[in-house]
Amino acid sequence: MSRPAGRTDWAEEDDETELALPSQTVVKNKDGSETITTYRVGEDGRRYKTTRRIKKTVIKTTVNPRVAERKQWAKFGQEKGKPAGPQTDTVSVAENILFRPVAAWKASNEDKGDEAKKKAELKNAKIKCRICQGDHFTTKCPFKDTMAPEGDVAPADMPDDAPGSASGGLGAGGGGYVPPHLRGRAGAGEKMGGKFDRDDSATLRVTNVSEFAEEQDLRDMFSRYGHVTRVFLAKDRETGRAKGFAFVSYADRTDAAKACEKMDGFGFGHLILRVEFAKKA
């Protein structure tokens, strides 16, 4: 059937348009680059010309001859017959990681672990006095001359005829020189002050103290039985509350004995106080 005169077949015109597109051209330039020209028909029916200029750069690198030889090997398995180089469907290309072995890597890791463990222990450690169990250093304890460290036993008095006594100037065991003021005292030293030295035997240890107690409260209670020279209430450094024990010192031991008798079992802050003489050093 012939086509009526004056009627246009758009499908045939599209075919003719596609067939009429020029072929791709490649032109080599003097500088070594290539100019590639292509033609296409867009969705709007218009023709578009695309010109690309490509310059190839050859980079030469020096590699190990063995590596270069392995690259020339014939591929096998799923890669058989494929060109040189990695194929995306069978090979996963990732970043090259440089591996540098270390001789003592295991020992270094263990040392780092030990250091971290020690730091954690020191971070959680708290200062604790060996004498009164307070949160301060033992050397700064106000009762270091009154009480002995917990677990220590006071040395026995040495007889007058023992080696290293006041009659000689040598030490008891090592044969070293002992100053005159230390002879006869087992190396403990002589306290200065003479008759003005305080009587540390008049110190009371008060336990089961309320955590809300204050030093002034204890001073007011114990001052009824004599002259109180000092009061020490152990407190927690973080919370500021009492830790449950305190020390009260009197100027006279008689007053301390009277206070110990009266205050032992005394109710304070919904708790029963336990009062006793502090152990001597």
Swiss-Prot record:
Signal sequence region: none
Family membership noted in the UniProt record: Belongs to the eIF-3 subunit G family.
Name of the protein described by the UniProt record: Eukaryotic translation initiation factor 3 subunit G
Origin: domain of life: Eukaryota
Protein function: RNA-binding component of the eukaryotic translation initiation factor 3 (eIF-3) complex, which is involved in protein synthesis of a specialized repertoire of mRNAs and, together with other initiation factors, stimulates binding of mRNA and methionyl-tRNAi to the 40S ribosome. The eIF-3 complex specifically targets and initiates translation of a subset of mRNAs involved in cell proliferation. This subunit can bind 18S rRNA.
Keyword Transport: no
Annotated region described as Disordered, given as residue ranges: 1-32
Species of origin: Phaeosphaeria nodorum (strain SN15 / ATCC MYA-4574 / FGSC 10173) (Glume blotch fungus)
CC annotations in GO: eukaryotic 43S preinitiation complex; eukaryotic 48S preinitiation complex; eukaryotic translation initiation factor 3 complex, eIF3e; eukaryotic translation initiation factor 3 complex, eIF3m; multi-eIF complex
Location in the cell: Cytoplasm
